[in-house]
Amino acid sequence: ALINFANISGINPTLLNAVEEINIKQLEQIISMTKQKLGDLASKKITILGTAFKPDTDDVRDSIAIKLIEKLLKRKAVVTIHDPKAIDNTRDIFGSKIKYSKSIKDALSKSQCVIIMTQWKQYKKLGNNEFNHMTKKLIIDCRRILIEKQLDVDYFAIGLGEEK
């Protein structure tokens, strides 16, 4: 939205364009990593934790998680999401194309991959007990909120996040 506004106003949004390019490359990296670990994504259950663009909001406008879900659906993945506040807004976008879970445990159940997209405090507390409900324990942490050495999973931290 800001990029479009800047372009309309005759301003070259160089920094915003760079951020957008990084976001697109991060999405490609997530898809590539998931395919490398799971193979063809068709019929694979992939759980997205967090669809809001930041914690403590239900706002999904310009959320990179929404773009990721679109890419996963194009590859025929079975997508389940959990978000403490943004489920309704996500449902407005995807309707019945994806599954919605009110509990983290249900979202993780029988999942083959979990991708953490929003830094909700609930997600920072996740550990082996929660991940044991998965059929394949592949975790892609796009916010770097989990400490790898405490987890008995295939764990990949990418993108920006908290310093560990």
Describe the role of every protein-language-model region.
Residues 1-164:
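Structural/interface elements that position substrates and couple domains in central-metabolism enzymes
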